[in-house]
Amino acid sequence: MASASYHISNLLEKMTSSDKDFRFMATNDLMTELQKDSIKLDDDSERKVVKMILKLLEDKNGEVQNLAVKCLGPLVSKVKEYQVETIVDTLCTNMLSDKEQLRDISSIGLKTVIGELPPASSGSALAANVCKKITGRLTSAIAKQEDVSVQLEALDIMADMLSRQGGLLVNFHPSILTCLLPQLTSPRLAVRKRTIIALGHLVMSCGNIVFVDLIEHLLSELSKNDSMSTTRTYIQCIAAISRQAGHRIGEYLEKIIPLVVKFCNVDDDELREYCIQAFESFVRRCPKEVYPHVSTIINICLKYLTYDPNYNYDDEDEDENAMDADGGDDDDQGSDDEYSDDDDMSWKVRRAAAKCLDAVVSTRHEMLPEFYKTVSPALISRFKEREENVKADVFHAYLSLLKQTRPVQSWLCDPDAMEQGETPLTMLQSQVPNIVKALHKQMKEKSVKTRQCCFNMLTELVNVLPGALTQHIPVLVPGIIFSLNDKSSSSNLKIDALSCLYVILCNHSPQVFHPHVQALVPPVVACVGDPFYKITSEALLVTQQLVKVIRPLDQPSSFDATPYIKDLFTCTIKRLKAADIDQEVKERAISCMGQIICNLGDNLGSDLPNTLQIFLERLKNEITRLTTVKALTLIAGSPLKIDLRPVLGEGVPILASFLRKNQRALKLGTLSALDILIKNYSDSLTAAMIDAVLDELPPLISESDMHVSQMAISFLTTLAKVYPSSLSKISGSILNELIGLVRSPLLQGGALSAMLDFFQALVVTGTNNLGYMDLLRMLTGPVYSQSTALTHKQSYYSIAKCVAALTRACPKEGPAVVGQFIQDVKNSRSTDSIRLLALLSLGEVGHHIDLSGQLELKSVILEAFSSPSEEVKSAASYALGSISVGNLPEYLPFVLQEITSQPKRQYLLLHSLKEIISSASVVGLKPYVENIWALLLKHCECAEEGTRNVVAECLGKLTLIDPETLLPRLKGYLISGSSYARSSVVTAVKFTISDHPQPIDPLLKNCIGDFLKTLEDPDLNVRRVALVTFNSAAHNKPSLIRDLLDTVLPHLYNETKVRKELIREVEMGPFKHTVDDGLDIRKAAFECMYTLLDSCLDRLDIFEFLNHVEDGLKDHYDIKMLTFLMLVRLSTLCPSAVLQRLDRLVEPLRATCTTKVKANSVKQEFEKQDELKRSAMRAVAALLTIPEAEKSPLMSEFQSQISSNPELAAIFESIQKDSSSTNLESMDTS
């Protein structure tokens, strides 16, 4: 420390030198010292350093002054608080100095100090004291109005301080407001502007009293309307407040909007511009409160979008349909753009109107149909706007409209609505000719910006409506070529033009472009040769698509591609050979050449083998190998049967080596390539090549990556079909891995299907030691030997499916094996595991093969219904149902008879019936529907809930077989006197809803409202199942319930309330335990709310929704967990609404995070509380992603609390790490 002090005192001495270079060097060295974390200053050194730095702020040399200011930043964090106060005092005094240079440097110094203070959320005393000290001095400097430049600096610093530390200055907010309000009438506009900025920052942290004072003052002054100049300022101020604190100003809009509407009619363009900007901020920041006024705002914007009093457009509307490709008379185009009038401010009004319409379109999804009637035609008619900046905003507004129309939401392309013909998509379709007509002239404008807007517009239009431009390609192609050939085009314009052309080529049929290929190929080829790599890259994508257009392989085409092959090949091969080009260009050149060979390879002659050799080189390069593998896969799959023999000998071993690389995408791509090569080139592959591949397969077949396993198994299946002689190799490690995978509980879906296909392909090859019985022993051996017990039930199902697959492939082996399984079930010495496997295997085999010839099968299965093992009983139930599917006339009447005569076995038999209804063909079941229906209705009033649920599922699935007859019958049971019957039919409806279109859908849409009326049922359980059914509809097919939300939501929200009458106390020995019978129904209601966020957000009143979310935050553990998840979703879906409610949401979150578990609680209680805290913290982290959330005083206070509590701080930190790593993972595209 002594040496540091000595070094610093040395520097201080040099700072007093008369030589400015000495002073500069010493200050620079001091700066370096202060930036070191290790530096410790004693009191004396602190005092001297502070004094010297402040003195150097007045140095004659500007460079020394600037360095001294920079020293303030690190100095503030290294000295004691009273020294910081000295610095601040001196800077404030100097700010009022007569010397302009000293004032400026002191202002910069104050901003530097404020910037270095710890944020308000850290709860730092230093920050609070410094800010309080500065505030008093600033308010007096602002209020004096003596020197405008001092005022401007003071306002600047005040705004900076309020934005960073506003929450610490709550006590000063009234005095700050008092000094700021008079500045709104300052004769200097710059002062007014900075005052507005400061007020904007003030409203984000001030208390309600100050906020009300400010708004009342503005409203009162606006009502007086003393002068046009101040009225403009007040409107600007209101817009700024709305932008910064829309969630607070909302409740005053009823008073504000009529005033702003009135001022729109005043003949003052600047005032109009500010009024419309205010509307824009209301639309974006106060979505709920502005809703009643949206139509008024749209009408005002549409009026002023065309407001151009000094210009006449009439003469421009001559016939625009003739568009020449040569663009001969372009020189005199765009002369209108040069029209300029310095006094004409009307363009600002038009621009404000366009931006405001953009805001309306972007925030009001529910008004899309209305927008296409009114806003869309108006915007299209203004594409001819003469001011370039305004035109860009008109285009942007239309782009926003198109983006809102993207059919990501199921309701936008709801088939029912489509039939009515009035959906946003159909309305857009009808306006495409007008859009093209309006863009047509703009595409040859001189302005680069305008042409870029046109390309962005066309790209988005085609993304929203693929095929929309089919009729208009002849009009658009010349405009695209114009930009590609135009010497004045910027690189970005060419890239946009190419990107647009690519999207159009991808989304229209090839025939549409055939008349234009001759015109398109030369400019695209020229762009492939462009020196700028981004243009080359985009042009290669277009070339690849053009190749598919000139010779489509998936449809007959009479177009002659021959004249274009040489040009396309030559420009691509040049890029393929180049070594020093950009990575993206390398990859796209490979993909493009792959497409050329795939579609045109039979025309390449001697160029083909040479090009394939280049591919071989690219295959050996780590950077290009994955793209090359994909290109080879494309070529190998070509119907032209390209001759790949020259590269297979060297290529296949290289591909085999890729299977051991630690790159998942490469493994998957290579397996696809090898699969297609085996299918199409088996005669060119040698046994050695295939053996090399087989050697690499065992590590790929593993439950750790089911997708890779599935691809590997599919490859083996292809091998078994095409190259059976190679399979003798697999009996060792490959087969061991396969059998191991069959026993994995994770084997299901696509991987399981691939496994079944493989066993069927393998068993018919007749390979030694891999016959039917060999494979059967391998699969079932462990169960019979009991050497290794299979722990998971799923493993038995998988083995049984494999056994059935083998038996289907070898039907002659069937009877003997089935007989053996029957004996295994009968044998009293069989273990439960053997019985389980035997029953499941009988079920799987019987599903596909008629087993009615096995006379004792029925009695053996019924006997198994009495087994003491639940798993064996369940397997017997499944087996009976599955076997019945194989011969319905034999088994179905038997099952129905047993259900009637065996009440004790009813539950298991109903499960068998469910299996039959779920799996049998509709035609096969039709004759039995009436009998099954009658039987089910007898049991739908059963008191046992498990039985009722199976009956309901059977009823639902049966209804799908004959909806016209059965759905009305189900509906009839809604008036049953039995609450059990009502709950059964409502649950049955759940099983008629699926996420893909079905014949029942239109019928269901007409009557689902009747089933949902049971949300008003007096019985609690009926209401609960109604919510579960509603949730299923909202999740799988939202179009069924969208139009019912207005009537359903009040009942749904009603079920989120805690009901005291449903809470009771139960005595358990010496303890009293509280039971809440309403918990399950509340949970069901909150689950529905969560689902609605994803499927019907545009139909929700989000503020009403948030009221119930707030209640849920104070409810039971399960419901809190659900509402925390909702908050995370809401933070991204509707941040502005959440921001308005932030203060009310923070309190319950804080309560959860600070709750302590009683010391004598059980471990489970501690774990539950810990999980609650983590979930609450995730919600807090999500809320903090909303811009400006941390500026809420309550939120910043809660943040301070989190950071000062080690336990909460640790949880919060780990959650933030998790979310950032998740974001990184989602960016990993490989």
From Swiss-Prot:
Lineage top rank: taxon: Eukaryota
Pfam families: HEAT_EZ (PF13513), TIP120 (PF08623)
Keyword RNA-binding belongs to the record: no
Residues with N-acetylalanine modification: 2
Region (Disordered): 315-344
Database matches in InterPro entries: ARM-like (IPR011989), ARM-type_fold (IPR016024), CAND1/CAND2 (IPR039852), TATA-bd_TIP120 (IPR013932)
GO CC terms: cullin-RING ubiquitin ligase complex; cytoplasm; cytosol; extracellular exosome; extracellular region; ficolin-1-rich granule lumen; Golgi apparatus; membrane
Residues carrying N6-acetyllysine: 55, 971
Xref: SUPFAM superfamilies: ARM repeat
Subcellular location as annotated: Cytoplasm; Nucleus
Keywords carried by this UniProt record: Acetylation, Cytoplasm, Nucleus, Phosphoprotein, Repeat, Ubl conjugation pathway
One GO process term, biological-process aspect: positive regulation of RNA polymerase II transcription preinitiation complex assembly
Gene3D superfamilies per UniProt: Leucine-rich Repeat Variant
Induction text: Repressed by miR-148a.
GO MF annotation list: TBP-class protein binding
Residues spanning the membrane: none
Intervals holding HEAT repeats: 2-39, 44-81, 83-119, 131-165, 171-208, 210-247, 248-282, 289-366, 370-407, 424-467, 471-510, 515-552, 563-602, 606-643, 646-683, 688-725, 729-768, 770-808, 809-845, 852-889, 890-927, 928-960, 961-998, 1002-1039, 1043-1097, 1099-1133, 1140-1189
Annotated positions of the Phosphoserine modification: 335, 558
Subunit structure: Interacts with TBP. Part of a complex that contains CUL1 and RBX1. Interacts with unneddylated cullins: interacts with CUL1, CUL2, CUL3, CUL4A, CUL4B and CUL5. Does not bind neddylated CUL1. Interaction with cullins is abolished in presence of COMMD1, which antagonizes with CAND1 for interacting with cullins. Interacts with ERCC6. Interacts with DCUN1D1, DCUN1D2, DCUN1D3, DCUN1D4 and DCUN1D5; these interactions are bridged by cullins and strongly inhibits the neddylation of cullins.
Note: A model has been proposed to explain the mechanisms of cullin-RING E3 ubiquitin ligase complexes assembly. According to this hypothesis, cullin-RING E3 ubiquitin ligase complexes exist in a 'stable' active state when saturated with substrate, occluding access to deneddylation by the COP9 signalosome (CSN) complex. The neddylation-conjugated cullin-RING E3 ubiquitin ligase complexes mediate ubiquitination of substrates and can recruit downstream factors involved in substrate degradation.
Functional note: Key assembly factor of SCF (SKP1-CUL1-F-box protein) E3 ubiquitin ligase complexes that promotes the exchange of the substrate-recognition F-box subunit in SCF complexes, thereby playing a key role in the cellular repertoire of SCF complexes. Acts as a F-box protein exchange factor. The exchange activity of CAND1 is coupled with cycles of neddylation conjugation: in the deneddylated state, cullin-binding CAND1 binds CUL1-RBX1, increasing dissociation of the SCF complex and promoting exchange of the F-box protein. Probably plays a similar role in other cullin-RING E3 ubiquitin ligase complexes.
Homology family: Belongs to the CAND family.
Designated name of the protein: Cullin-associated NEDD8-dissociated protein 1
